[in-house]
Amino acid sequence: HYIDRTGCPRNYEMVSRDRNIDSLAHLQQHRTDAVVMVLTDAKREHMALNHEFRMELGQRIYGLPGGLIEPGETPEEAARRELGEETGLQLVAITHVLPPAACTVGIGDERTVCLFGIAEGTFRPSSDPMEEIESAWYTRAQVRALHETDLFGSWALAYSWMFANGCLPGV
């Protein structure tokens, strides 16, 4: 509940992973919920993308590897764990880590760290039976073609477009 600038009482509903929000001060405490990864192979010729079923959309979309940060984990530790769980790949180098970003503005309070790096290994299905993920390496041309026909998550669309068009830093 809050009072808007005209003095009218209002209700605002949002989604949060924090079940204990009891004040504005609590809401404004900065925490990082998740990590996403923008990953290439060592030659930087391919980008790793997940093709996954998203229950909230009722369809498969292309996304970036990533997931929730467990209590006590750093974003880098979570990235290594999530990458292995989702794809079977190993994170061999981290080249950039962006500060936390508000990724669900208008809906929730989630903050996500975006990590850039190099991965290697053999793809395998997700170890989580609740996740329907097919991961693979994609060339720039393949990514451009997918952009014409398939749905992407917002982070994946932005960073894969940059990769496909030679605009991704360090690639």
Show which residues each predicted segment covers:
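Unchanged
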Residues: 33-36, 67-156, 170
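A short, polar/proline- and glycine-enriched secondary-structure boundary/capping micro-motif
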Residues: 22-25, 58-63, 136
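Short, amphipathic C-terminal "tail helix"
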Residues: 158-171
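Short loop segments at secondary-structure junctions
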Residues: 5-6, 41-44, 53, 118-123, ...
